[in-house]
Amino acid sequence: MSGSSRVWVEHVTVRPDRIVADIRIADEACVLTSEDMIDKALCRYPHLLDHACVNDWGETFGAVASRTSVAHLVEHMAIEGQARVSSGAKSLFVGKTSWANRAKLLARVEISYEDDLVALASLRAAVLFADYLLAEREEARFCVGEAPLKTEKRNGNESAGCFRIPYNG
């Protein structure tokens, strides 16, 4: 963990069929996603809302995206990251997110893979991006009264604009 991270991988196990990662959340304020986070995530992971997802609100990740755990968002971003570079058009990746210890803000994310190195890189990128999104949200909370973020119209709705962040991969 770096000194100011809000989410990080605490432990990873590579199994023959999946990666199991323990994801630590820094504090309770960082546990859940928000609509703004999802809008920004869609710039990098445009198919997130269409992922099949077992949940209490619908059949896709979109049904819960703006009110789910950040660890669950990491799962879906890591899966989409793998799908992007997958060797087969019919590749199917599955994942599961659960709380290993909710009181200690420790989640367990499991994702299947074709190539373990691609899966690990996708997981790393997803965690770094989730941390960036949480930092943006935190900064927005502390900068009340400053100039608003640039917005754009998408499907008739105003949303945060797409952006680039430096990647030191």
Which stretches of residues belong to each language-model region?
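His/Glu-rich zincin catalytic helix
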Residues: 1-86, 124-127
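M16 family metallopeptidases and their MPP-like homologs
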Residues: 86-129
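Acidic/histidine-enriched alpha-helical segments
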Residues: 133-156
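Short, low-order "capping/linker" segments at domain edges
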Residues: 149-169
